[in-house]
Structures are given as C-alpha cells and as structure tokens.
C-alpha cells in the first residue's frame, strides 16, 4: 500500500509540470519578446553597428546602439553692471 501511495505521488508530481518541449518553446518565445522590447531582431549575424544583446534560441538578438547626443554645458559669464 505504501508503494502504491509513493507511486501515485510520483506520477501526480511529474504530470503536473509542463513538458520539456513546451517549456523550451515558451522560453524561446519569451526571449524573442524581450529582444523586440529592446528594439532588436533575432537573426543569424549582427552587423557592425549592432551588438549582441543575448541569444534567441540559436541566433543572436542584434540590437542597435542608441545614439545619444553629447551633453554640452554652455559656459555663460555674468557681467556685473554698476
């Protein structure tokens, strides 16, 4: 009877989780979605103006470096008027 109880417990715990192919498919879809969030694309090779954000399944997620304007602090002098 104990063996039957242990066997049933094992069967129920194993059957409750997602199967390996379903889990892998879900992970790949999440990676592709994250790649799109950073405005990237999953493709075989990145161009020179792109960097590898991470890998979507087998191909890299290529994201474009964002151009940021340099911050220029203007130096202004105040003339004292008397």
From Swiss-Prot:
Give the highest taxon in the source lineage.
Answer: Eukaryota
Localization per Swiss-Prot or TrEMBL: Secreted
According to the UniProt entry, where is the signal peptide? 1-16
- Give the primary localization class: secreted
The question of whether Magnesium is a record keyword is answered with: no
Can you name a GO cellular component term? extracellular region
Provide the alphabetized UniProt keywords.
Answer: Antibiotic, Antimicrobial, Defensin, Disulfide bond, Secreted, Signal
SS bond list: 35-61, 42-56, 46-62
**Would you kindly state one Gene Ontology biological process term found in this protein's UniProt entry?**
defense response to bacterium
State whether keyword Disulfide bond applies: yes
Family the UniProt entry places it in: Belongs to the beta-defensin family.
Q: What does this protein do?
A: Has antibacterial activity.
**This protein's name:** Beta-defensin 113
């Amino acid at each position: 009877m104990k063996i039957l109880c242990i066997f049933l417990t094992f069967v129920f715990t194993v059957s409750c989780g997602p199967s390996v192919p379903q889990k892998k498919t879900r992970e790949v879809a999440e990676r592709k979605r994250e790649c799109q969030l950073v405005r990237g694309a999953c493709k075989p090779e990145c161009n020179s103006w792109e960097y590898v954000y991470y890998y979507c399944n087998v191909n890299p997620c290529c994201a474009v470096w964002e151009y940021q304007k340099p911050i220029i602090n203007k130096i202004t002098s105040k003339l004292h008027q008397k």
